[in-house]
């Protein structure tokens, strides 16, 4: 299987988010990379499902809460930016303060 670099990055996000969700299901609090992976994955999938940029920007701050992550992680992530593929092209989605 030959994947372009962009597709390799997306696959890495999927694997990282899956691992993070498994750890979360075991009751573990998420660290910085795990939180980023889950938020990124959900935004990419939301775009694929046809949600708008505005919807994703709003929804992105509800994916994880402070209770889901280790202490200090919310302050380490002031925003998340994801280049997502929408039905009408690729757009940048920015979520400010994604963990509240």
UniProtKB/Swiss-Prot annotation:
EC identifiers of the protein: 3.5.1.5
Chemical reaction(s) catalysed: urea + 2 H2O + H(+) = hydrogencarbonate + 2 NH4(+)
Q: Which GO terms describe its molecular function?
A: nickel cation binding; urease activity
Which InterPro entries does its entry note? Urease_gamma, Urease_gamma/gamma-beta_su, Urease_gamma_sf, Urease_subunit
Q: What are the alphabetically sorted keywords of the record? A: Cytoplasm, Hydrolase
Q: Which Pfam families match?
A: Urease_gamma
Disulfide bond positions: none
Q: Subcellular location, in the record's words? A: Cytoplasm
- GO terms for cellular component: cytoplasm
Family stated for the protein in its record: Belongs to the urease gamma subunit family.
Record note on quaternary structure: Heterotrimer of UreA (gamma), UreB (beta) and UreC (alpha) subunits. Three heterotrimers associate to form the active enzyme.
NCBIfam families the UniProt entry points to: PRK13241.1 (NF009712), urease_gam (TIGR00193)
What protein is this chain from? Answer: Urease subunit gamma
Question: What is the source species?
Answer: Kocuria rhizophila (strain ATCC 9341 / DSM 348 / NBRC 103217 / DC2201)
């Amino acid at each position: 299987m030959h994947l372009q670099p962009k597709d390799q990055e997306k696959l890495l996000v999927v694997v990282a988010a899956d691992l993070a969700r498994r750890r979360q299901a075991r009751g573990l609090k998420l660290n910085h990379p795990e939180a980023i992976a889950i938020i990124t994955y959900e935004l990419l999938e939301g775009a694929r499902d046809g949600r708008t940029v505005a919807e994703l920007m709003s929804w992105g701050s509800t994916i994880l809460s402070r209770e889901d992550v280790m202490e200090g992680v919310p302050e380490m992530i002031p925003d998340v930016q994801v280049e997502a593929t929408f039905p009408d092209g690729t757009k940048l989605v920015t979520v400010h303060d994604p963990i509240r």
